[in-house]
Amino acid sequence: AFAGILADADITAALAACKAEGTFTHGEFFTKIGLKGKSAADIKKVFGIIDQDKSDFVEEDELKLFLQNFSAGARALTDAETATFLKAGDSDGDGKIGVDEFAAMVKG
């Protein structure tokens, strides 16, 4: 799904680094997968993949399964990790993350 945007080796390394529950931090993950240095267009493409229901927002249930976008066998985020991730990205407080909020969080 991320072919041409992200390197498989970077994804594998990023997933390995947060395999244990409670070890996921979005900033570290975005850095490890090489997303921070990508163009706005590429970040928007990644957002489109994570936005499973194509609502133009990433909601809490989609964040919980965030890692599974990168590998089907990856774990779900814990409730605490999901809440922290949502809070970090939801700058307008509407309970979901839009594409501009996502881009700001990635670049953060």
From Swiss-Prot:
Entry-linked Pfam families: EF-hand_7
Domain EF-hand: 38-73, 77-108
Keyword rRNA-binding: no
Miscellaneous comment as given in the Swiss-Prot or TrEMBL entry: Is regarded as an important allergen. On the 2D-gel the determined pI of this protein is: 4.30, its MW is: 11.30 kDa.
Role according to the record: In muscle, parvalbumin is thought to be involved in relaxation after contraction. It binds two calcium ions.
Binding site for Ca(2+) 2: 90, 92, 94, 96, 101
GO cellular component terms given for this protein: cytoplasm
UniProt organism field: Merluccius australis australis (Austral hake)
UniProt-recorded Gene Ontology molecular function terms: calcium ion binding
Domain of life of the organism encoding this protein: Eukaryota
Sequence positions bearing N-acetylalanine: 1
Name this polypeptide is given: Parvalbumin beta 2
Keyword Metal-binding belongs to the record: yes
Keywords tagged on the record: Acetylation, Allergen, Calcium, Metal-binding, Muscle protein, Repeat
Family as reported in the entry's similarity comment: Belongs to the parvalbumin family.
Binding site for Ca(2+) 1: 51, 53, 55, 57, 59, 62
